[in-house]
Amino acid sequence: MSARFGVVVFPGSNCDHDAYHAAHDVFDQEARFIWHEEASLGDVDVVIVPGGFSYGDYLRSGAVARFSPIMQDVVRFAEDGGLVFGICNGFQVLCEAGLLPGTLMRNESLRFVCKDTPLRVENAGTPFTNALTEGQVITIPVSHGEGRYYADEDVLARIEANDQVLLRYSTADGAVTDEANPNGSVHGIAGLVNEAGNVCGLMPHPERCVESLLGGDDGRLIFESLLNHVSIVAA
């Protein structure tokens, strides 16, 4: 089971090394950094658009990064069916680039939120969640100031009807409540995929919890899902 990971790096990215560490050091996969000024992704199986504050979050989170030269090839790769995984700021970039529906707004509290967060699995049938089970509750940390997912009613209805929601913020026993929602995201949405299922945006940080030494390793399940999918496709 082997996959080639490309981790996109923008000015202001600060979770790129965490994503690289998870793929290369923890899972022993081929991985490399891809600078924002590059024109081609090269030979990769999975593109990770990592967290951080790309371009200082000027204008709004992800708004400048989506115009980086490398994003043209990220869009091309996604449209060709390649796996693209946006984490936190990466989620914001993918929404700005039109690869995912909706947008991310300032947290309802107007405060930065950084804590471990229980998440209920809604769809375990995607390349990003196949190592999980529907209804399972996992815990992954969040760390963001603009993580409130929003879409209009028509878009939300389509997302829900297509089973595009992967994870929702929940209590430890799986109840989706306002109190369990750290940022005010509509429908408690923490992560979702595009209609084709090959592009994922996730506000929590699975790359920060792939080793039990750090207090939890539920994030491993996301990376294991990606490796499972790549292995099946390669076969």
UniProtKB/Swiss-Prot annotation:
Main localisation: cytoplasm
- Kindly state which reaction or reactions the protein catalyses: N(2)-formyl-N(1)-(5-phospho-beta-D-ribosyl)glycinamide + L-glutamine + ATP + H2O = 2-formamido-N(1)-(5-O-phospho-beta-D-ribosyl)acetamidine + L-glutamate + ADP + phosphate + H(+); L-glutamine + H2O = L-glutamate + NH4(+)
Q: Which pathway or pathways does this protein act in?
A: Purine metabolism; IMP biosynthesis via de novo pathway; 5-amino-1-(5-phospho-D-ribosyl)imidazole from N(2)-formyl-N(1)-(5-phospho-D-ribosyl)glycinamide: step 1/2
Localization, UniProt: Cytoplasm
Q: Could you tell me which residue ranges the Glutamine amidotransferase type-1 domain spans?
A: 5-235
Where is the catalytic site?
88, 205, 207
What keywords sit in the KW lines? Answer: ATP-binding, Cytoplasm, Glutamine amidotransferase, Hydrolase, Ligase, Nucleotide-binding, Purine biosynthesis
Q: What EC number(s) is this enzyme filed under?
A: 6.3.5.3, 3.5.1.2
Q: Which GO terms describe its biological process?
A: 'de novo' IMP biosynthetic process
Which molecular function terms from Gene Ontology are attached?
ATP binding; glutaminase activity; phosphoribosylformylglycinamidine synthase activity
Q: InterPro entries annotated for this entry?
A: Class_I_gatase-like, PRibForGlyAmidine_synth_PurQ
**How is the quaternary structure described?**
Part of the FGAM synthase complex composed of 1 PurL, 1 PurQ and 2 PurS subunits.
NCBIfam families to which the protein is assigned, alphabetical: FGAM_synth_I (TIGR01737), PRK03619.1 (NF002957)
Q: What does this protein do?
A: Part of the phosphoribosylformylglycinamidine synthase complex involved in the purines biosynthetic pathway. Catalyzes the ATP-dependent conversion of formylglycinamide ribonucleotide (FGAR) and glutamine to yield formylglycinamidine ribonucleotide (FGAM) and glutamate. The FGAM synthase complex is composed of three subunits. PurQ produces an ammonia molecule by converting glutamine to glutamate. PurL transfers the ammonia molecule to FGAR to form FGAM in an ATP-dependent manner.
What is the official name of this protein in its record? Phosphoribosylformylglycinamidine synthase subunit PurQ
Q: Which organism is it from?
A: Salinibacter ruber (strain DSM 13855 / M31)
